[in-house]
A protein has these predicted regions:
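Residues immediately C-terminal
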Residues: 73, 128-132, 163, 234
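Motif I (Walker A/P-loop) of helicase-class P-loop NTPases
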Residues: 39, 46-56, 137-142
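Conserved nucleic-acid-binding Ia/Ib motif block in the N-terminal RecA-like helicase ATPase lobe
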Residues: 61-113, 169, 179
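Conserved C-terminal RecA-like helicase domain
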Residues: 65-67, 72-78, 82-90, 233-273
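Short hydrophobic/aromatic beta-strand immediately N-terminal to the Walker A/P-loop
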Residues: 37-40, 65, 155, 226-228
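Conserved interdomain linker/interface between the two RecA-like ATPase lobes of SF2 helicase motors
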Residues: 143-147, 152-155, 160-248
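Conserved pre-motif I regulatory segment
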Residues: 1-40
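SF2 helicase catalytic motif II
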Residues: 108-110, 116-155
Length: 273
């Protein structure tokens, strides 16, 4: 007969329990007290869990709009929460579905007119709020925050803002009650490497900063490599340049049909080349 400890360990419901850290509990407590919350915490530390706890796993009273910078991120969140059985809608530039759901994942620009009308949700989540500093989209983010009606609480999440305290001061100047929750521990270590310290001799046939840098990094076994570009066109141009100049891998990637549909035919061809 198994011990009580073994029975508890085998209980699937217990294996799925997530116990929030103190900083996450503080953020949820502040939200439930009616305050705006600005969260500064590293990637992978559990910022999204704050919203999930506040919403009681998608069973929140009143609507919450969870905004993300890109349509791809919106689709990811939609799929994740629907897989858990949540009633979730989506609003992006090219898709609007189930907009009366308790939780709607959206790009922020789709909500601007609603906020201007004063028709805000109970909670507006701005994930990756460092977009305030974006040269092209920052104005839309600033307007959305400044025009959010008093009855709409704000939850602003980021891991890459150097001065979150100034954002809190700005919210207070707007007449809002705002607090800063800061968490410094990084669950995924981050090491900085200077490009000049990579000593691999790149062949002269490889030209341009990024192709030469990626060649050096791969030679030092620093892959996989993820490069961010401000726009899709820039990302595709860079991907094409890298695919053209870097030596091909011994086994080009053979994507499944669903993977080809996800990345698009253009990028699928690059991966095969």
């Amino acid at each position: 007969m198994s011990s009580i400890a073994e029975q508890l360990a085998a209980a699937s419901s217990l294996n799925q329990v997530t116990v929030p850290d103190l900083w996450q509990q503080e953020a949820v407590t502040a939200l439930r007290a009616g305050k705006d919350v600005v969260v500064q915490a590293p990637t992978g530390s559990g910022k999204t869990l704050i919203f999930e706890l506040w919403s009681k796993q998608g069973k929140n009273r009143g609507q919450a709009i969870y905004t993300v910078p890109t349509r791809a991120l919106a689709n990811d969140k939609l799929a994740e929460w629907r897989a858990r059985g949540w009633d979730v809608g989506i609003a992006t530039g090219d898709l609007a579905e189930n907009l009366d759901a308790p939780v709607v994942v959206a790009t922020l620009e789709t909500q601007k007119n609603r906020l201007i009308r004063g028709d805000g949700p109970v909670l507006l989540v701005i994930d990756e709020y460092q977009m305030l500093g974006d040269a092209d989209r920052g104005l839309n983010y600033e307007l959305a925050i400044a025009l959010a009606p008093p009855q709409t609480q704000l939850l602003m999440l980021s891991g890459s803002v150097a001065n979150p305290q100034d954002v809190v001061k700005w919210l207070i100047r707007l007449g809002r009650q705002a607090v800063l929750i800061r968490h410094e521990h990084r669950p995924v270590p981050l090491d900085e490497v200077f490009a000049n310290n990579l000593n691999f001799a790149v062949p002269s046939s490889v030209r341009g900063y990024w192709p030469r840098f990626v060649t050096k990094a791969l030679a030092d076994d620093l892959g996989p490599i993820l490069i961010f570009a401000p726009r899709r066109q820039g990302a595709e141009t860079l991907a094409a340049d890298l695919a053209r100049q870097l030596p091909p891998p011994p086994h080009p990637l053979d994507l499944r049909v669903d993977q080809k549909q996800m990345v698009g035919e253009h990028l699928a061809k690059l991966l095969r080349s």
